[in-house]
């Protein structure tokens, strides 16, 4: 399914004329009025191409290619003047965000009672999904408000990445997982906003689980302490502080700290570790009011991906800072996601996907500016961004990053379309490899159950028929099931030693070397360590 607008526009003091060129003649026009909150279609046509033009209102067009096995569900927002063309054998549904009027443009017969000989019922959008789309679809750019967003890639309806299942009887909750691109400010974001409470009130990702991240945050604490002259009496606030992994090294230097963490279990862990932590969301006034001291430094590591209310978070950060304070964030780098095709970093917790270009546009709208940018080797490629008021000196790194991004094409839609095609190629290649291994009678065990594992395994359709179980170092995940594909997760224990598999599929691929080095006995016994990126 695709949409287009008219062209060859003529404008004078009477108004405007927009012309549409259709690929075939029209012999029927259907005038269709639809009320806000209702659904139409939920069907597919075996032979007839469908076309309609929206006259007024707005609706979400939902479609799925039935010719392609395991094709994902995709959405796009339709606004007045848009023509949508739905090809044969494509299931489609219309979910109306407003009272709307559209015209069906038909070439052929049109006599049928709701579902006649031209249409075949297909419940693409059930009642639960209707409500989800009406309540949580994000039609406008979170950064600039533009509603003309373009789909980059749809990974279908998938479960929440870190909401592991307790047992086989627990049902999966599925939500649309689709990344859109804003041509105006070059922000990338998810089309659907799952309520924050569903994802962050209890959280199983613990930053201190791996030595890699403990070292990263310890090194970052040393760097920022020296860079900003932090000392005893200085005060640092960390937004989304997890278990206090960044603040603890600062505490040991005699620096006063305060974490803000929405997950109750992680707040408790941090407090048990002696790190003062407020359990709440930083964008909420009730949380902000508990911070009684002005901060020399406010940090937000990977928070800018995880929030649907970034403007308020940013304003709050500067509200609690001293006039000469500093705001430092880290985000996964969109440049690396596209260049390295690390699409498994796309999941519901990550509302936003950032480049320096898009972050710069975001902060400029708040009368702030990026003063420096550094590369960070975490999560498959990240950036550390220093943000200040307009009077701060700007390091050459800012323009250097933006120039590199423009050269790569982060400001061009075709770059994102090319990424989408590469994602499809990765899926096809990986499924062939898994099939060859299983056809040869090889056993496969997963290693690591990060959020990215939920994305890639559900998108590929790889379940417990292919992967026997997943080994996980984080004890909070032991005994649970990866959602959707329902692969059991367990501790390492002695199970690998007793019956080592032929292949260990490292799902936490950003820790591949670390995991392999710490399991040399399995390498010596003939286990082959692989990733879905091989």
Regions picked out by a protein language model, each given a short descriptive name:
Residues 1-27, 41, 132, 136:
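A short, N-terminal "cap"/entry segment at the start of jelly-roll beta-barrel domains
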Residues 66-87:
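Short acidic-glycine-tyrosine-enriched beta hairpin
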Residues 95-133:
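Double-stranded beta-helix
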Residues 136-212, 374:
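N-terminal juxtadomain amphipathic helix
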Residues 163, 329-352, 356-359, 363:
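Short, glycine-/aromatic-enriched active-site segment of Class I SAM-dependent methyltransferases
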Residues 311-326:
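A short glycine-rich, Lys/Arg-flanked "PGG" loop and its adjoining helix->strand segment in the class I
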Residues 324-332, 528-531:
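Conserved beta-strand signature within the Rossmann-like core of class I S-adenosyl-L-methionine
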């Amino acid at each position: 399914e695709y949409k287009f607008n008219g062209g060859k526009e003529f404008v004078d003091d009477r108004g405007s004329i927009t012309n549409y060129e259709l690929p075939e003649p029209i012999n029927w026009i259907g005038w269709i009025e639809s009320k806000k909150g209702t659904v139409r279609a939920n069907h597919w046509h075996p032979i007839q191409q469908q076309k309609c033009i929206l006259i007024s209102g707005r609706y979400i067009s939902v479609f799925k290619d039935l010719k392609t096995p395991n094709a994902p569900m995709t959405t796009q927002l339709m606004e007045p003047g848009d023509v949508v063309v739905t090809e044969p054998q494509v299931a489609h549904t219309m979910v109306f965000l407003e009272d709307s009027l559209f015209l069906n443009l038909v070439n052929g017969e049109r006599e049928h009672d709701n579902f006649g000989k031209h249409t075949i019922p297909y419940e693409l959008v059930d009642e639960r999904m209707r409500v989800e789309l009406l309540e949580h679809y994000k039609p406008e750019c979170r950064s600039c408000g533009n509603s003309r967003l373009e789909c980059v890639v749809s990974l279908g309806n998938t479960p929440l990445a870190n909401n592991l299942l307790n047992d086989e009887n627990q049902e999966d909750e599925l939500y649309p997982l689709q990344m859109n691109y804003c041509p105006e400010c070059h922000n990338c974001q998810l089309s659907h906003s799952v309520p924050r409470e569903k994802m962050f009130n209890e959280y199983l990702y613990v930053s201190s689980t791996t030595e890699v991240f403990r070292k990263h945050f310890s090194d970052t604490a040393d760097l920022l302490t020296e860079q900003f002259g932090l000392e005893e009496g200085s005060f640092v606030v960390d937004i989304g502080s997890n278990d206090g992994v960044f603040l603890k090294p600062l505490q040991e230097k005699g620096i006063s700290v305060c974490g803000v963490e929405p997950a109750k279990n992680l707040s408790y862990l941090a407090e048990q570790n002696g790190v003062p932590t407020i359990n709440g969301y930083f964008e909420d006034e009730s949380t902000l009011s508990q911070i009684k001291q002005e901060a020399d430094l406010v940090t937000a590591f990977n928070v800018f991906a995880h929030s649907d209310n970034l403007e308020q978070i940013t304003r709050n950060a500067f509200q609690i800072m001293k006039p000469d304070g500093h705001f430092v964030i880290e985000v996964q780098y969109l440049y690396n996601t596209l260049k390295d095709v690390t699409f498994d970093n796309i999941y519901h917790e990550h509302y936003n996907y950032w480049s320096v270009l898009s972050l710069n546009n975001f902060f400029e709208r708040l009368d702030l500016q990026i003063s420096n940018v550094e590369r960070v080797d975490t999560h498959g490629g990240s950036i550390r961004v220093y943000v200040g008021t307009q009077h701060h000196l700007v390091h050459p790194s800012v323009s250097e990053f933006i120039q590199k991004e423009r050269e790569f094409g982060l400001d061009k839609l075709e770059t994102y379309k090319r990424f989408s095609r590469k994602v499809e190629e990765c899926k096809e290649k990986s499924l062939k490899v898994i099939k060859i291994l299983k056809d040869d009678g090889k056993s496969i065990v997963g290693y690591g159950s990060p959020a990215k594992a939920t994305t890639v395994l559900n998108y590929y359709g790889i379940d417990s028929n292919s992967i026997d179980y997943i080994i996980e170092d984080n004890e909070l995940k032991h005994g649970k099931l990866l959602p959707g594909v329902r692969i059991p997760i367990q501790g390492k224990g002695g199970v690998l030693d007793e019956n080592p598999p032929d292949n260990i599929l490292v799902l936490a691929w950003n820790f591949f070397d670390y995991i392999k080095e710490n399991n040399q006995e399995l390498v010596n016994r003939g286990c082959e360590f692989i990733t879905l990126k091989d």
